[in-house]
Amino acid sequence: MGIFSFFSKEKKETLDKGLSKTKENVFTKITRAIAGKSKVDDAVLDNLEEVLITSDVGVETTLKIIDRIEKRVERDKYVTTSELTGILRDEIANLLTENKTEDGDGFTLPEDKKTYVIMVVGVNGVGKTTTIGKLAYQFKKAGKKVYLGAADTFRAAAVEQLVIWSERVGVPIVKQKMGSDPASVAFDALSSAKANDADVVIIDTAGRLHNKINLMNELTKIKNVMKKVIPDAPHEILLVLDGSTGQNAFEQAKQFTAATEVNALAVTKLDGTAKGGVVIGISDQFKIPVKYIGLGEGIEDLQVFRKREFVNSLFGE
């Protein structure tokens, strides 16, 4: 089933608006890079390389893109600057890791996994709890039975914020007192969700990056305890990154992917930044699909990531 069946005009407008600063930033620079040139030559490619690096795409991914364009120019002998954006768009789309759910009808869950367990990781301040709340809203809207687990027990604000979201969305939450063992909360949340035949349970975790070994041990313990309730849990480890932090998001991705088996990304706060290029670099470098993007503060402003729509929006189509 094609993606256009599910990508409404309203969603496209939200995406275009959310990426407008990034688009303006990248396009202005590309226009400047090819000014006065009719064909793609070394000077244009050097300028384009600088554009991509300064647009937070990342050095490794940028060099990969430039190399592919160079090969295309070599093969076709003559490539005009007017063709460059089309080639660039295709190469970026090819580099983005496939999100298997992007062809589906919005926020879907695998039919063969019930109760589906999502463990959410990320540093404090990236919009982790808000992303969980918006995910819960979308799953409930899709007719799913949702449970939340407040396993970030080190920050009172994290638990309080998740309680507010559970009340706002109208889904049950499992929590314990401040300072409780996070693994114990996860165990209780999965037990309750399973006993009540929930479709999905979303577990919040602490966002502390003070020590990689501690982080790894903490997340491993939570995962091991989950498996006692649901043997193949967690099915999804979703890393939430703040798109507006640019290269800092790369560092966070590096630390969390070293600490645990992240298999999905949510990139938030893309609406207020010109650094949306970070989505391309992170997906390529870590070979992890971007599953969701945050494009605003509204409850509907979390979207399923569709790479072709993202790239088209980035290039003003």
Task: Mark where each language-model region is.
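Switch/coupling subdomain of P-loop NTPase systems
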Residues: G2-F4, K9-L15, S20
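Short beta-alpha junctions and helix-cap segments that line functional grooves
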Residues: I3, G104-G106, L135, E251-Q252, ...
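Short acidic/polar alpha-helix capping motifs at helix-coil junctions
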Residues: K11-D16, G125, T153, L215-L219, ...
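Primarily NTPase-proximal linker/entry elements flanking Walker-type ATP/GTP-binding cores
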Residues: D16, S20-A151, A158-M178, A186-K194, ...
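Non-catalytic, surface-exposed connector residues within folded enzymatic/regulatory domains
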Residues: D42, L63, Y78, S82, ...
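Short hydrophobic/aromatic residue motifs in ordered secondary structure
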Residues: V59-T61, R155, D271, I299
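Conserved catalytic-core segment of NTP-binding enzymes
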Residues: Q161, D181-N196, N211-G316
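Short glycine-rich anion-binding loops that position phosphate/pyrophosphate groups of nucleotides
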Residues: A206-R208
